Amino acid sequence: MIDKRTMLAFVGGFAAIGAIAVALPHSVPAQAQGDARVASPTGEPVLIELFTSQGCSSCPPADKVAAKMAPSPGVVVISRPVTYWDRLGWKDTLAKEANTELQQAYARRGLSGQNGVYTPQAVVNGRFGTVGSRELEVRRGVAHNSGAGNAAIRVNDLGANGYGVGLGGDTAKTAELVLIGVTREVEVAIGSGENGGRTVTYTNALRDETRLASWNGGKASHVVTPAQLRVKGANRYALVLREPGGGPVLAARWLN
């Protein structure tokens, strides 16, 4: 049960996003390639999803790019290990079929940049795809493909009651709010396959994702309960507002 004082604090923080369409800044210059920080033109965090695999010899350089970019407050980086290279003999210990299905859905819808199902692939805001090891291209994707959703997520810590989540903005189609649990850093000793004998570190590796609510634009609120933050192996959580079926990402933000 959430007490009245806690809920009032949440509502007060949420009210600030009511005018999101006019409150967002128009532009922020992109950072230089060598700078570890990443800038979004709208000032809202940009989602970068890295489709990677322990069975892909081309993936470790992309995993390093993900680790380099992840600390920036301007992005939400999530590693999504896929299952389709398991057939080569080494079963990826982090792979999820849901990751493979999302990548396939992106390819069916069609991304700008380099579309298709391959690894390593970085997908920016569900709109732009490129080889995940090409850092400059990933950064260009952040600069050119953010803010198109005209939406925002705001979070208010409710202490023992979880987190209050406020949504604001517009959408042309019904979107869904998704809670994603990740492990900040996972070091894996790969026993065989193309990367056999190597130890690779994965950043913000997805453990589980749960659909919280649908959204049709305007102001909306939701509470993420403590029980929803008990995903096995997860020590960080992100919120993603996206059109379903491999549709574009409208907003993303770290919950904690």
Q: Where is each model-derived feature located?
A:
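Ligand-binding face of N-terminal immunoglobulin V-set domains in extracellular IgSF glycoproteins
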Residues: 122
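Short loop/turn motifs enriched for small/polar and acidic residues
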Residues: 80-83, 125, 158
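Short, conserved sequence motifs used for protein processing/export or organelle targeting and
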Residues: 93-115, 127-256
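Active-site-proximal cofactor/substrate-binding loop regions of enzyme domains
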Residues: 2-111
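Extracytoplasmic
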Residues: 43-45, 72-75, 117-119, 174, ...
